[in-house]
């Protein structure tokens, strides 16, 4: 496993790409609409998780009776700061309490959500007080435990048993050895699984074009408090059609908030410059749309006129109908994880000469003696910290490219650990150790080629697919420059698009990454191989570190936001469903 080569192919294959060979790679109106929506916040996967709590063998701090326990939940930031999120009710006189009150939290794949749980014995004099008014420093501390939300949801039965420990900073000898266990169980909200399929039809849409009919499409957005509506779905663009019948659109109840949450449905006339004209809009909930479907009635679009207090809506003759409204329950990302599917992390690091001499402070590979991470180390750690929870053995393939290892010619895919036979290392720290060792055991060279490392990752994914393994692979490529094998890289990506593989690319340094962005399907360009084959799905996500390092979105969030969707697209394209597994003991 892990052999590298440079012939632009990989052992094994995959299905022929959906769409066939003769399609153009030019961006279509529908691709441009995708990019337009993403610029307005259409992104990411969000699931509502309900956590329930119980405990066993709590420490008894009461003299006459047993403890009266309450659990408090905090979120823990990267800097260690705590923010309280939830308090349970108080369960009286029990060392094995089962709390009734549950805690609901939004699961976000791209963020490490660290939770801290503290259990208190509530003093008798406060038992008639509301939980939220209790002063915790006046209660007896029974123990605390911490874990990430990812650790809970990746368990086969979504249950984790945590040993309650003393508070951080309290001397070990002052604390009894046994404080009991806290059991945390997660359930995904049904709203996350409930999918609504809707077919919209327009009638007598007004023309916004002078010499032709409009090219209409719909954008469905949810209304958020104190903010611009956020797009959650859209239809395709239909050319020159005043009476369009669009393909079905899918919405989960979770996406929109609830079935009664108001939605803005905009009908727009597509323009190639991105400035789409508003034909008209309506505001309706899913419940309203269902009623329109059952009644067979249309609703008139309205066009806002005027501004400020003079704002009015002009009701149009143009109408919108709901020809189909069905609700189904779909498999979710978390269901696949619970049934045993894993995400396997891989990394490939650029050692080309343009990075600079690693012994000098101006090098992108410079190891700061103060411990401050360079850009390569940051990307490895931050992406790895998220993905490691989804890989049971935490053995990660790691490669370098663009350098001359000891005793061999320049290689565009060599094992980072220095081995000639295997590429895996143990854990994120193993990657960091192999990276640090390689810096001074290879000679930086060039050029910058991606094809060989993508082919190496594709080989592993292809072999896993042949064995029907429940694995999906994520390759992180970190680079400082523009690739010189653009077409070969396109070919590799198109071939890999049928495999259980996604590719994350981080650009470090000040290079011009326009060519790199072509590989990322976010901007509506379909990747085409040299043989004319079209990628069956988008598997690449690219970010330039300089573009976001001072912004509000972290490198990890920008890279990983689309990964669950890419995973689900692969599973649904191949009709792979989660299988029920027997719950294992914690």
From Swiss-Prot:
Lipid-linked residues (N-myristoyl glycine): 2
Residue ranges of domain C2 in the record: 25-164, 176-303
GO cellular component, one term: plasmodesma
Listed cofactors: Ca(2+)
Sequence positions that bind Ca(2+): 62, 68, 121, 123
Residues of the VWFA domain: 344-563
UniProt tissue specificity: Expressed in roots, leaves and stems. Expressed in young growing tissues.
Molecular functions (GO terms): calcium-dependent phospholipid binding; metal ion binding
Domain of life of the native organism: Eukaryota
GO biological process terms, semicolon-separated: defense response
Membrane topology recorded in Swiss-Prot or TrEMBL: Lipid-anchor
Disruption of the gene: reported phenotype: No visible phenotype; due to partial redundancy with BON1 and BON3. Bon2 and bon3 double mutant has no visible phenotype. Bon1 and bon2 double mutant is seedling-lethal when grown at 22 degrees Celsius. Bon1, bon2 and bon3 triple mutant is seedling-lethal at any temperature.
Pfam families: C2, Copine
Presence of keyword Ion transport: no
Protein location: Cell membrane
Alphabetized UniProt keyword annotations: Calcium, Cell membrane, Lipoprotein, Membrane, Metal-binding, Myristate, Plant defense, Repeat
Role description: Negative regulator of cell death and defense responses. May repress a number of R genes and may have effects in promoting growth and development. May function in membrane trafficking and in fusion of vesicles with plasma membrane.
PANTHER family per UniProt: COPINE, PROTEIN BONZAI 2
Subunit structure as annotated in this protein's UniProt entry: Interacts with BAP1 and BAP2.
Family designation: Belongs to the copine family.
Protein name: Protein BONZAI 2
Organism name: Arabidopsis thaliana (Mouse-ear cress)
Organism lineage: Eukaryota, Viridiplantae, Streptophyta, Embryophyta, Tracheophyta
Gene name for this UniProt entry: BON2
């Amino acid at each position: 496993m892990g052999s590298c080569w440079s012939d632009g192919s990989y052992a094994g294959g995959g299905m022929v790409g959906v769409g066939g060979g003769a399609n153009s790679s030019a961006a279509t109106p529908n691709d441009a609409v995708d990019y337009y929506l993403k610029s307005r916040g259409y992104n990411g996967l969000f699931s509502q998780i309900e956590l329930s709590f119980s405990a066993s063998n709590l420490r008894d701090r009461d003299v006459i009776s047993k403890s009266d326990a309450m659990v408090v939940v905090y979120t823990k930031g990267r800097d260690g700061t705590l923010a309280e999120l939830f308090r349970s009710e108080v369960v009286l006189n029990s060392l094995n309490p089962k709390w009734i009150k549950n805690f609901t939290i939004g699961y976000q794949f791209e963020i490490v959500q660290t939770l801290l749980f503290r259990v208190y014995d509530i003093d008798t004099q406060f038992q008639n007080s509301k939980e939220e008014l209790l002063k915790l420093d006046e209660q007896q501390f029974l123990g605390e435990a911490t874990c990430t939300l990812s650790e809970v949801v990746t368990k086969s039965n979504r249950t984790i048993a945590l040993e309650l420990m003393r508070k951080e900073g309290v001397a070990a000898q002052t604390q009894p050895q046994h404080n009991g266990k806290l059991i945390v169980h997660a359930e995904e909200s049904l709203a996350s699984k409930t999918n609504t399929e809707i077919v919209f039809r327009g009638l007598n849409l007004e023309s916004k074009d002078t010499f032709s009919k409009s090219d209409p499409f719909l954008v469905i957005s949810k209304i958020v408090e104190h903010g611009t509506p956020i797009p959650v779905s859209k239809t395709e663009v239909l050319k020159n059609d005043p009476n369009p019948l669009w393909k079905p659109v899918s919405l989960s109840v979770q996406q929109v908030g609830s079935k009664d949450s108001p939605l803005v449905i905009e009908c727009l006339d597509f323009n190639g410059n991105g400035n789409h004209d508003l034909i008209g809009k309506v505001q309706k909930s899913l419940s309203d749309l269902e009623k329109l479907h059952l009644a067979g009635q249309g609703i008139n679009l309205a066009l806002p006129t005027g501004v400020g207090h003079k704002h009015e809506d002009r009701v149009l003759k143009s109408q919108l109908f709901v020809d189909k409204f069905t609700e189904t329950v779909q498999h979710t990302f978390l269901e696949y994880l619970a049934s045993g599917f894993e995400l396997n992390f891989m990394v490939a690091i650029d050692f080309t000469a343009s990075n600079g001499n690693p012994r000098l402070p101006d090098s992108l590979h410079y190891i700061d003696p103060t411990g401050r991470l360079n850009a390569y180390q940051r990307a490895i750690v931050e992406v790895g910290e998220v993905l490691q929870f989804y890989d049971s053995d935490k053995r990660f393939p790691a490669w370098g490219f663009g350098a001359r290892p000891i005793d061999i010619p320049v290689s565009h895919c060599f094992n980072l650990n220095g081995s000639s036979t295997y590429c895996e290392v143990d854990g994120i720290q193993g990657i960091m150790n192999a990276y640090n060792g390689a810096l001074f055991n290879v000679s930086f060279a060039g050029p910058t080629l991606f094809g060989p490392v993508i082919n190496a990752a594709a080989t592993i994914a292809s072999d896993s697919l042949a064995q029907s393994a429940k694995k999906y692979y994520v390759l992180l490529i970190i680079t400082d420059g523009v690739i010189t094998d653009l077409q070969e890289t396109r070919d590799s990506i198109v071939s890999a698009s049928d495999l259980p593989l996604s590719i994350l690319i981080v650009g470090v340094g000040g290079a011009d990454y326009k060519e790199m962005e072509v590989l990322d399907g976010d901007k509506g360009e379909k990747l085409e191989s040299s043989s004319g084959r079209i990628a069956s799905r988008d598997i690449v996500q690219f970010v330039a570190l300089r573009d976001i390092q001072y912004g509000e979105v972290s490198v990890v969030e920008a890279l990983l936001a689309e990964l669950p969707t890419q995973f689900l697209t692969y599973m649904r394209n191949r009709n792979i469903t989660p299988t029920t597994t027997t719950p294992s003991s914690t």
